[in-house]
Structure formats: structure tokens, C-alpha cells
């Protein structure tokens, strides 16, 4: 069975955006964004994903990847 992997670090690097800057734009704490970035979460709210995509000007598929 595969798994969904978060690639937030890659998208942030492409956009040259720091965790602090993204945190301020999204309205999520640095700690929670860090957990998202490192994949130490089991779920993410659509509203949070939407806010991240808005801040990074990307699509959910740019952040989420299905790996077999």
C-alpha cells in the first residue's frame, strides 16, 4: 500500500519562502507548519491546505504526492 507524502519543503524552497513568512500568511503556528512540513501529521484540514496553496500560489498536487 502506498502513502501520501507532503512536499511542502520543496514548494517553499521554490518560492523562497521561510516557515515564519508562510506561518504569518496562512495563520497557522510555526510549530504546526513545521509538523506539516516534516510530515509528522496524519491529517490536514482542507482549509489549511487551501490557505497554504493560496500563500504559495500552487495547487494541492504540488504539495501532496502519492508514493507506492
Which sequence ranges carry the predicted segments?
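Residues within the helices of the helix-turn-helix
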Residues: 9, 20, 50
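DNA major-groove recognition helix of helix-turn-helix
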Residues: 37, 67
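The alpha-helix within a helix-turn-helix
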Residues: 12, 23, 53
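DNA major-groove recognition helix of helix-turn-helix/homeodomain DNA-binding modules
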Residues: 47-62
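A short, Lys/Arg-rich alpha-helix, primarily the initiator
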Residues: 1-17
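Short alpha-helical DNA-recognition segment
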Residues: 17-35
Amino acid at each position: 500500500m502506498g502513502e501520501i507524502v507532503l512536499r511542502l519543503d520543496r514548494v517553499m524552497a521554490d518560492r523562497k519562502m521561510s516557515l515564519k513568512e508562510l506561518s504569518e500568511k496562512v495563520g497557522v503556528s510555526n510549530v504546526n507548519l513545521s509538523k506539516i512540513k516534516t510530515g509528522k501529521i496524519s491529517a490536514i484540514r482542507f482549509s489549511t491546505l487551501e490557505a497554504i496553496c493560496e500563500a504559495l500560489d500552487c495547487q494541492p498536487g504540488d504539495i501532496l504526492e502519492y508514493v507506492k
